[in-house]
């Protein structure tokens, strides 16, 4: 039996499941969910002698660790599984490793509270004895993105078609979506995520929502069911925002070390930076907007982890940055991150107010070394379009309106580019 299946059940479903193992309903009604799960696992262990569990490792300062559950957003929970320092040292396990193994229920007479890992079966889908071969993420060679992530997947999804031409995203891209309030940022992130899931099922996609509203989290999970949506809502403490983001990053790094392509969509880098500003010890130096001088170090490490790896694999991070919120802190955070990315997509509030969606500022949006991602025809046509726009003095409103109309009349970008000739 797999413990993760139990974790997904509601309390009522657990009650029905418990009856199959002789746990009486009148008894189970008086116990908590964790105790009920432990009773089921003990009964299963007594009958079959083997219980399988899976989780993502978080190592602690004392040397031991716990397997955290995706269902609890990798935060501390009653379903966590203890893993001993000896096992961590023996296999060279790291935070973020996805571990599958045999576990046993806690011993009441020893005062144990958590399930314990008995035997490791796989680490990141591979045999644990092969772990000594894997490299460290920081030792891998970063290069410019040279393989485009094609976001075009439906004729009516105009935003992803425009991104494909104006600011293409490659494997290993470090991209910023610069967005004022109510400019269509969330819808755009959902379309980007759906395009990746549709066109690249082999890419592991994480959507990390920090300091978001709970209903936004539910909507994201329903709109992008194929992605792993991890969230720390605004009613959580800042240290939990930081813990969740670090766990997602470490899990992504472990996958990249195994030569997988990983994408993290972060909403938003601004709120993550705000959380670190409250968590880091005060340095005594306060910058513009109340930002501590040490606060942005870890958010920059998060964003800077995005890279295309020469040895194989890539980590792509697309993060939203909030501007024009009326907060000097938000503006300062954007200014600090502005030069660190190699792709920027700007959304315009004026276009959104005119109900022009996607409200993309084509003139301000671009990708560094886009020649490595675009075809020769795409590159020449887009350069000609930008040059024509500047020479004719065409304003942004008129340009995006024309582009949207032309794209609505064509089925794909290849047909749109042919239309530009006329």
Language model region names:
Residues 49-53, 158-162, 248-253, 302:
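Phosphate-interacting basic helix/loop segments used at nucleotide- and nucleic-acid interfaces
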Residues 40, 55-61, 68-71, 85, ...:
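Flexible glycine-/small-residue-rich
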Residues 1-47:
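Basic helix-extension-helix modules of the SAP/HeH family
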Residues 5-6, 25-28, 108-112, 369-373:
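Short acidic, glycine/proline-enriched loop segments that cap or flank alpha-helices
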Residues 175, 182-186, 191-422:
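P-loop NTPase catalytic core
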Residues 29-131:
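N-terminal "pre-motor" subdomain/linker immediately upstream of P-loop NTPase catalytic cores
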Residues 93, 108-177:
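P-loop NTP-binding catalytic core
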């Amino acid at each position: 039996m797999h413990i993760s299946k139990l974790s997904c059940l509601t309390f009522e479903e657990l009650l029905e499941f418990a009856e199959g193992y002789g746990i009486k309903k009148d008894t189970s009604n008086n116990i908590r969910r964790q105790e009920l799960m432990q009773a089921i696992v003990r009964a299963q262990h007594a009958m079959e002698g083997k219980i399988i569990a899976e989780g993502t490792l978080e190592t602690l300062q004392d040397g031991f660790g716990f397997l955290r559950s995706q269902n609890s957003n990798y935060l501390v929970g009653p379903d966590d599984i203890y893993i001993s320092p000896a096992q961590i040292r023996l296999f060279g396990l790291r935070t973020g490793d996805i571990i599958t193994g045999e576990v046993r229920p806690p011993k009441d007479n020893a005062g144990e509270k958590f399930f314990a890992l008995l035997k490791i079966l796989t680490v990141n889908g591979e045999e644990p004895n092969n772990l000594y071969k894997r490299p460290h993420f920081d030792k891998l060679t970063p290069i410019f993105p040279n393989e485009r992530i094609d976001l075009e997947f439906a004729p009516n999804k105009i935003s992803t078609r425009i991104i494909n031409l104006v600011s293409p995203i490659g494997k290993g891209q470090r991209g910023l979506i610069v967005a004022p309030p109510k400019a269509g940022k969330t819808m755009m992130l959902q379309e980007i995520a759906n395009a990746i899931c549709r066109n690249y099922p082999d890419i592991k996609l994480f959507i990390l929502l920090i300091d978001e509203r709970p209903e936004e989290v539910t909507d994201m999970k329903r709109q992008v069911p194929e992605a792993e949506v991890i969230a720390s809502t605004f009613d959580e403490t800042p240290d939990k925002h930081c813990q969740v983001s670090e766990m997602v990053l470490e899990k992504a790094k472990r996958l990249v070390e195994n030569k997988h392509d990983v994408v993290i969509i972060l909403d938003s880098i601004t709120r993550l930076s705000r959380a670190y500003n409250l968590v880091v010890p005060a340095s005594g130096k306060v910058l513009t907007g109340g930002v501590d001088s040490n606060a942005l170090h870890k958010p920059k490490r998060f964003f800077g982890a995005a890279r295309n790896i020469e040895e194989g694999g890539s980590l792509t991070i697309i993060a939203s940055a909030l501007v024009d919120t009326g907060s000097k802190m938000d503006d300062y955070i954007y200014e600090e991150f502005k030069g660190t990315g190699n792709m920027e997509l700007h959304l315009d509030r004026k276009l959104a107010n005119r109900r022009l969606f996607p409200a993309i500022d084509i003139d301000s949006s671009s990708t560094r070394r886009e020649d490595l991602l675009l075809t020769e025809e795409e590159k020449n046509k887009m350069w000609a379009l930008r040059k024509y726009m500047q020479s004719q003095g065409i304003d942004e409103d008129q340009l995006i309106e024309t582009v949207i109309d032309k794209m609505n009349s064509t089925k794909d970008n290849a047909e749109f580019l042919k239309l530009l000739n006329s």
